[in-house]
From Swiss-Prot:
Its main location: cytoplasm. This is Pyridoxamine 5'-phosphate oxidase C1952.08c homolog. GO terms for cellular component: cytosol; nucleus. Its cofactor is FMN. Binds 1 FMN per subunit. PANTHER family: PYRIDOXAMINE 5'-PHOSPHATE OXIDASE YLR456W HOMOLOG-RELATED. It is found in: Cytoplasm; Nucleus. Belongs to the pyridoxamine 5'-phosphate oxidase family. Pfam families: PNPOx_N. InterPro entries: PMP_oxidase-like, Pyridox_Oxase_N, Split_barrel_FMN-bd. FMN binds at residues 62, 69. Keywords: Cytoplasm, Flavoprotein, FMN, Nucleus.
Length: 190
């Protein structure tokens, strides 16, 4: 697979697009060399949308105080996240739709269903009952107000976690390409 480094500090559009179109993200935490992975609902906040608390792009998650991920993050704030757009490719078309519509729909979905992004960052459990926690909880609720996901944001023991993004690997299957990004502009080793 070809690989290139994005030397700019700007958050790549492929990552923004993938984060904006996905509902779930895979969170990986670690404690004493024992990894743990969780499928999570999340909120992506582009740079500037979380002022005055955050100026850069960030991701918001929530978890219970008694969860393994909460314990792991409290002990080791380094996390990895995986997000992809493949799920859009599995949506069924309307059985009553015309064959032209079905063809165009499938072609359109195929264009979007080839990217996966691995993000690395530092997770911070926000101070309980702080204005910052209230601010980010509200943003997270606005994203997760449908169905049963709201229960994972509200609640006495639910904590809000902010992840500052440090680096990423963007894999594009169509182009057999891996692009690397680093918030500081440094070259990432992997």
């Amino acid at each position: 697979m070809a690989s290139k480094v994005d030397s700019s500090h700007e958050f790549p559009s492929q990552i923004k697009r993938c984060l904006s179109s996905s509902k779930y993200i895979q969170l990986a935490t670690c404690f004493h060399d024992q990894p743990h992975s969780s499928l999570m609902t999340f909120t992506y906040l582009p740079a500037g949308s979380a002022a005055p608390y955050e100026v850069e792009d960030c991701i918001i998650l929530s978890t219970g105080e008694n969860s393994k991920k909460y314990f792991n993050i409290s002990s080791n704030p380094r996390v990895s996240l995986l997000v992809h757009d493949w799920t859009t490719n599995r949506q069924e078309t309307d059985p009553d739709a015309s064959s032209l519509y079905t063809l165009l729909y499938k072609m359109n979905q195929a264009q979007f269903s080839n990217t996966s992004v691995t993000l690395n960052g530092l997770a911070t459990v926000l101070p309980k009952n702080s204005k910052e926690e209230e601010f980010f909880r509200e943003k997270h609720l606005n994203t997760n107000d449908k169905g049963n996901t709201k229960q994972y944001v509200e609640g006495e023991d639910m904590r809000i976690i902010k992840i500052k993004l440090e680096s990423a690997r963007i894999c594009d299957q169509r182009l057999n390409n891996v692009q690397k990004w680093n918030a500081r502009g440094d070259e990432t080793p992997f």
